[in-house]
């Protein structure tokens, strides 16, 4: 592999592109890869190091700990301009790196590394431009339970996806929003979690994917936690998803149906009968939260009917032991979900009106920030709409549709447009 090392050390940009022809050879040189890597400087020969590390990542017999250290050094010190010449290879290396950390049960080691690496393929705009590294970063945050590291990223608005620049694929996009939903759920930001899962479910599809199935399962349970019932599929859900997904989620759909009459015994029975499936999918905790949310919702309904109730009456009406009912009421008062006071002498609960003040500076600042976000999004949507309207692919589709009279209202104009 002397010729590869010489070409990798040649600073000519045209020569760097030629390095890609060595990929298959490197895949067959697993024994020599560390020596080849040692002959290259990470700063000056980044593309060469990238190809060597990618080849090493595919070696099932590699020393994972050494590989992780080598990747750490590469991601922190590589020449960004060089590695951007090979986005597909960089994305694959990121995945090998993430897998190695998972296999060693050390995902936390990669969180800070990939957080910095987000800039490489996003042109230093990681909060607006989605890349495959984003997905790997979120996966490591979830595996290491470092959710707070991912929150600022997923709360930003992604407005750019460039497959040519980042080699991003539909699986990366779906996984990004699926992982985002998991992280939002961990922070109890259920509405945002629902939107993230909904993105996966409603993404255009010609076949049902495993990611969509898992997103739908979580979507159903989180929707129950937030709203207490689930009516229909989200708008724009592909027909193939609507036709086939329920057969993969039978315990979930049955559990959802048990909420329709609000009978807590029915809900508990369906939860018990599907417990094995829920635990296997790591959704048992969410199922228990959805049951708790039913109790909370029933207690909240009482505040709309009664001014005063005893703890015993509340416990009876929501089918809870007295001590549990009191715990629920105290927790709901503490979290501002209801406004009430408990008289410890006679065990009476007095429900008060909402004392929230919507005129303070915090509310005004939030309102101002949200308005600015909407204005920015509107501007971005107009820009994207104009770009699509003037694209050759769209104009060809439009002309073709006019000639045949078969232009689809939704799918055809957007098909194959990058």
Swiss-Prot record:
Residues 186-356 form the PCI domain. Disulfide bonds: none annotated. Gene3D superfamilies: Winged helix-like DNA-binding domain superfamily/Winged helix DNA-binding domain. Its main location: cytoplasm. Pfam families: COP9_hel_rpt, PCI. Keywords: Cytoplasm, Nucleus, Signalosome. Coiled coil: none annotated. PROSITE patterns: PCI. SUPFAM superfamilies: Winged helix' DNA-binding domain. GO terms for biological process: ubiquitin-dependent protein catabolic process. One of its GO terms (cellular component) is cytoplasm. It is found in: Cytoplasm; Nucleus. The keyword Nucleotide-binding does not apply. Component of the COP9 signalosome complex (CSN), a complex involved in various cellular and developmental processes. The CSN complex is an essential regulator of the ubiquitin (Ubl) conjugation pathway by mediating the deneddylation of the cullin subunits of E3 ligase complexes, leading to modify the Ubl ligase activity. Belongs to the CSN3 family. Component of the CSN complex. The holocomplex is comprised of 8 subunits csn1-8. In the complex, it probably interacts directly with csn2 and csn5. This is COP9 signalosome complex subunit 3.
């Amino acid at each position: 592999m002397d010729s590869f090392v010489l070409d990798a050390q040649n600073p000519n940009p045209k020569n760097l592109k030629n390095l890609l022809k060595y990929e298959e050879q490197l895949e067959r040189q697993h024994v020599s890869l560390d020596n080849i890597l040692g002959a290259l400087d990470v700063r000056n020969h980044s593309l060469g190091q990238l190809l060597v590390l990618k080849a090493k990542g595919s070696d099932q017999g590699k020393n994972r700990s050494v590989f992780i250290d080598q990747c750490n050094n590469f991601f922190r010190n590589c020449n960004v301009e060089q590695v951007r010449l090979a986005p597909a290879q960089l994305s694959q290396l990121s995945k090998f790196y993430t897998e190695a950390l998972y296999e060693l049960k050390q995902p936390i080691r990669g969180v800070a590394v990939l957080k910095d690496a987000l800039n490489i393929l996003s042109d230093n705009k990681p909060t607006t431009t989605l890349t495959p590294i984003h997905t790997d970063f979120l996966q490591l945050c979830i595996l290491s339970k470092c959710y707070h590291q991912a929150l600022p990223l997923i709360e930003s608005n992604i407005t750019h996806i460039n497959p040519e620049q980042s080699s991003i694929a539909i699986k990366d996009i779906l996984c990004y929003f699926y992982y985002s939903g998991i992280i939002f759920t961990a922070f109890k930001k259920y509405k945002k979690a629902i939107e993230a899962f909904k993105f996966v479910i409603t993404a255009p599809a010609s076949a049902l994917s495993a990611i969509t199935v898992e997103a739908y399962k979580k979507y159903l349970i989180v929707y129950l936690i937030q709203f207490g019932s689930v009516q229909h599929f989200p708008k724009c859900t592909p027909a193939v998803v609507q036709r086939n997904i329920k057969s993969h989620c039978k315990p979930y759909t049955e559990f959802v149906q048990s909420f329709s009459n609000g009978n807590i015994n029915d809900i508990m029975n369906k939860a018990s009968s599907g417990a094995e499936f829920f635990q296997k999918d790591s959704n048992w905790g969410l199922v228990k939260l959805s049951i708790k949310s039913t109790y909370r919702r029933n207690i909240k309904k009482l505040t709309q009917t009664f001014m005063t109730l005893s703890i015993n009456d509340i416990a009876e009406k929501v089918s809870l032991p007295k001590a549990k009912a009191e715990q629920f009421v105290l927790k709901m008062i503490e979290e501002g979900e209801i406004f009430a006071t408990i008289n410890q002498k006679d065990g009476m609960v007095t429900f008060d009106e909402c004392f929230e003040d919507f005129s303070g500076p915090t509310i005004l600042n939030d309102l101002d920030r949200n308005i600015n976000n909407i204005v920015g999004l509107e501007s971005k949507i107009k820009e994207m709409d104009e770009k699509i309207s003037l694209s050759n692919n769209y104009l060809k589709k439009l002309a073709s549709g006019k000639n045949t009279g078969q232009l689809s209202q939704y799918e055809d104009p957007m098909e194959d447009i990058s």
